Amino acid sequence: MNLNLLKYYIKENHDTVSTLALALDIHYITLTLKLNGKREFNKHEIEIISKRYNFDAALTMKIFF
């Protein structure tokens, strides 16, 4: 998992942990734990993030797997 690359895309898209957490319908602390590698993203969250930032399949794989 390449969390630094995901953090880059969050900033590049002028998003914050709070706004992304709202889009994922999770608490911002839960998202922070996921961004720090303490918890894993589930399939639904990966789909939402990939659509939100227009990731292609290769980039999704690079970031999350």
Residues of each region from the PLM?
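A short, Lys/Arg-rich alpha-helix, primarily the initiator
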Residues: 1-15
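Helix-turn-helix DNA-binding elements, focusing on the entry/boundary residues of the two helices
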Residues: 17, 28, 46
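Short alpha-helical "recognition helix" segments of helix-turn-helix
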Residues: 19-22, 49
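Recognition helix of helix-turn-helix/homeodomain-like DNA-binding domains
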Residues: 26-41
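DNA major-groove recognition helix of helix-turn-helix/homeodomain DNA-binding modules
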Residues: 44-59
